[in-house]
């Protein structure tokens, strides 16, 4: 079936049509975006600058997750911030397809990375004596390759489905971004089958990975019965951060993509949560509960202060 699109651009309704609310949206989400990119890139730089952290699979995955969060947020948030300054918010057909592809690509990669991080914690807690031999560089590289490939396949399937839809008008999207269900409502054809394919593709990757995560942590919790109280506390503290991130990311995704298409006002709020707020919260969750990351950040800060003092002394 050849794409029969006549629409050259879409109009986004955004979060609100009220000018006062749009001003608040601009200020709040500009601050959130700066904090998101700054916080996540700080973790990336910290891990890359700390050899002791970089050789650890857990921190390797954490750095990769932070990079993904910065990219994922940058796909949607900057345009949303700029659009809040305008009464009419438009996006070209090509721009809409690119946004849709990038959103699902980075989300698909992140889903698999979170699953890989759960497996890393499973091996570290349940098979500590074999951790170094199992979680070696080769396996970490394979897991990253699987994540990139899985995200690419997922986004390619979504975009190929969307390109088959004819858009002949209207062109108003009741959202602040291009997403599958709002686009299905605008298609000039019966989208029942396409809606089911969205559920199968997006819902499948969410539910399968979420199930693997649940199994991993169920096994971890069962294995903690044989650990000392100190060992249990350390394991729970390490896993707690990851569990919080998993819940914050997966629950909104499953809510949005595992149901049939319908006009549901809470979709916008769910999208704000997993696209904008979740990448902001991830650095806070991991750094506040992780002594090694905080110590590495202090060392980097101290080195910067030393370099700054040396430059001042040279000027004098």
Curated annotation (Swiss-Prot):
<feature type="topological domain" description="Extracellular">
    <location>
        <begin position="258"/>
        <end position="268"/>
    </location>
</feature>
<protein>
    <recommendedName>
        <fullName>Olfactory receptor 4C15</fullName>
    </recommendedName>
</protein>
<dbReference type="InterPro" id="IPR000725">
    <property type="entry name" value="Olfact_rcpt"/>
</dbReference>
<keyword id="KW-0807">Transducer</keyword>
<dbReference type="GO" id="GO:0004984">
    <property type="term" value="F:olfactory receptor activity"/>
</dbReference>
<feature type="transmembrane region" description="Helical; Name=4">
    <location>
        <begin position="139"/>
        <end position="157"/>
    </location>
</feature>
<feature type="transmembrane region" description="Helical; Name=7">
    <location>
        <begin position="269"/>
        <end position="288"/>
    </location>
</feature>
<comment type="similarity">
    <text>Belongs to the G-protein coupled receptor 1 family.</text>
</comment>
<feature type="topological domain" description="Extracellular">
    <location>
        <begin position="79"/>
        <end position="99"/>
    </location>
</feature>
<dbReference type="Pfam" id="PF13853">
    <property type="entry name" value="7tm_4"/>
</dbReference>
<dbReference type="InterPro" id="IPR017452">
    <property type="entry name" value="GPCR_Rhodpsn_7TM"/>
</dbReference>
<keyword id="KW-0297">G-protein coupled receptor</keyword>
<keyword id="KW-0472">Membrane</keyword>
<feature type="topological domain" description="Extracellular">
    <location>
        <begin position="1"/>
        <end position="23"/>
    </location>
</feature>
<dbReference type="InterPro" id="IPR000276">
    <property type="entry name" value="GPCR_Rhodpsn"/>
</dbReference>
<feature type="topological domain" description="Cytoplasmic">
    <location>
        <begin position="218"/>
        <end position="234"/>
    </location>
</feature>
<keyword id="KW-1003">Cell membrane</keyword>
<feature type="topological domain" description="Extracellular">
    <location>
        <begin position="158"/>
        <end position="194"/>
    </location>
</feature>
<keyword id="KW-1015">Disulfide bond</keyword>
<feature type="transmembrane region" description="Helical; Name=1">
    <location>
        <begin position="24"/>
        <end position="47"/>
    </location>
</feature>
<feature type="transmembrane region" description="Helical; Name=2">
    <location>
        <begin position="57"/>
        <end position="78"/>
    </location>
</feature>
<keyword id="KW-0552">Olfaction</keyword>
<keyword id="KW-0325">Glycoprotein</keyword>
<feature type="topological domain" description="Cytoplasmic">
    <location>
        <begin position="48"/>
        <end position="56"/>
    </location>
</feature>
<feature type="transmembrane region" description="Helical; Name=3">
    <location>
        <begin position="100"/>
        <end position="119"/>
    </location>
</feature>
<comment type="function">
    <text>Odorant receptor.</text>
</comment>
<dbReference type="GO" id="GO:0004930">
    <property type="term" value="F:G protein-coupled receptor activity"/>
</dbReference>
<dbReference type="InterPro" id="IPR050427">
    <property type="entry name" value="Olfactory_Receptors"/>
</dbReference>
<keyword id="KW-1133">Transmembrane helix</keyword>
<dbReference type="GO" id="GO:0005886">
    <property type="term" value="C:plasma membrane"/>
</dbReference>
<feature type="disulfide bond">
    <location>
        <begin position="96"/>
        <end position="188"/>
    </location>
</feature>
<feature type="topological domain" description="Cytoplasmic">
    <location>
        <begin position="289"/>
        <end position="316"/>
    </location>
</feature>
<feature type="transmembrane region" description="Helical; Name=5">
    <location>
        <begin position="195"/>
        <end position="217"/>
    </location>
</feature>
<feature type="transmembrane region" description="Helical; Name=6">
    <location>
        <begin position="235"/>
        <end position="257"/>
    </location>
</feature>
<feature type="glycosylation site" description="N-linked (GlcNAc...) asparagine">
    <location>
        <position position="3"/>
    </location>
</feature>
<keyword id="KW-0716">Sensory transduction</keyword>
<keyword id="KW-0812">Transmembrane</keyword>
<keyword id="KW-0675">Receptor</keyword>
<feature type="topological domain" description="Cytoplasmic">
    <location>
        <begin position="120"/>
        <end position="138"/>
    </location>
</feature>
């Amino acid at each position: 079936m050849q794409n029969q699109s006549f629409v050259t651009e879409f109009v986004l309704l955004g979060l609100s049509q009220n000018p006062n609310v749009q001003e608040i949206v601009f200020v709040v989400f500009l601050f959130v975006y700066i904090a998101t990119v700054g916080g996540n890139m700080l973790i990336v730089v910290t891990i890359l600058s700390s050899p002791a952290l970089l050789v650890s699979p857990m921190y390797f995955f954490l750095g990769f997750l932070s990079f993904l969060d910065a990219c994922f947020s940058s796909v949607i948030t900057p345009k949303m911030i700029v659009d809040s300054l305008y009464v009419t918010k438009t996006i070209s057909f090509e721009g809409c397809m690119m946004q849709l592809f990038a959103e699902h690509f980075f989300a698909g990669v992140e889903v698999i990375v979170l699953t890989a991080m759960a497996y890393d914690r499973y091996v570290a807690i349940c098979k500590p004596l074999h951790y170094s031999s199992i979680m070696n560089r080769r396996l970490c590289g394979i897991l990253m390759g699987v994540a990139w490939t899985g995200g690419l396949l997922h986004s390619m399937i979504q975009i190929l489905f969307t390109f088959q839809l004819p858009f002949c008008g209207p062109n108003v999207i009741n959202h602040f971004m291009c997403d599958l269900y709002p686009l299905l409502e605008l298609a000039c054809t019966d989208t029942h089958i396409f809606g089911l394919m969205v559920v199968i593709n997006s819902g499948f990757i969410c539910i399968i990975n979420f199930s693997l995560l649940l199994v991993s942590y169920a096994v971890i919790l069962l294995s903690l019965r044989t650990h000392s109280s100190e060992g249990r506390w350390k394991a729970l503290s390490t896993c707690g951060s990851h569990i919080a991130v998993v819940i914050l990311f997966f629950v909104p995704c499953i809510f949005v993509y595992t149901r049939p298409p319908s006009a549901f006002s809470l979709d916008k709020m769910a999208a704000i949560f997993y696209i904008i707020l979740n990448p902001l919260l991830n650095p806070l969750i991991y750094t506040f509960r992780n002594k090694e990351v905080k110590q590495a950040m202090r060392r980097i800060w101290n080195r910067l202060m030393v370099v700054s003092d040396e430059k001042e002394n040279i000027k004098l």
